[in-house]
Amino acid sequence: MENYKNKMLTPKERAKDLLERMTVEEKTGQLNQRLYGFRIYERDGKNITLTEEFKEEVKRWGGIGVLYGLYRADPWSGRNEENGITNELSREAYNTVQKYVIEHSRFGIPMLLASECPHGHQALGGGLLPVNLAVGATFHPKLLSKGYEVCGRQLASGHVDLALMSVLDILRDPRWGRSEECYSEDPFLSSQMAAAAVSGMQKTGVSAVAKHFCAQGETTGGVNASAARI
């Protein structure tokens, strides 16, 4: 048995053996998150089929490192109740995608799944919290932590590994179109709320990706993704 398959060895020993066997392309594939998950499938009723775009990506990199937004549903993604992944279909969809990735990876490496969680899970049937700006006005970190425990359990039920959480931005310019993602203009209050949100999420076993680092809120003229004034 190859060392990377030997569960009696430490994770470090298994990873070392696996890395020594992988090509540069395969390693690169494990480090990127460029594919939009909401573009990798087509839904016909309750049937989920994988797109050629997804299959070509797996083939190019010998696997998928992180898949972003499989469950995302909003005007930007173009997914809704008619063509998106509902709670009812989430298990089948995840299993279909993960099975394909594992079977088409030379070493059977499973993908990680990342999902947007700006104020709750951004998905069909996702539980939502008030926007961050409203939550910041409560000055109640403990309550926020409990809210994210609920969100975390929902993400975990959908096999989500990474929750992308907008918790670090400081509101400097109210013209910015994403001001509601900030807890406050005050760094201390924002830090307390961010710590509470991350703590609540990670109690469920889902890893929190705290964003945006750094200075996304320091926009020029309030224009999103413009030059940042640091």
Predicted regions and their residues:
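Glycoside hydrolase catalytic-domain context in secreted enzymes
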Residues: 1-230
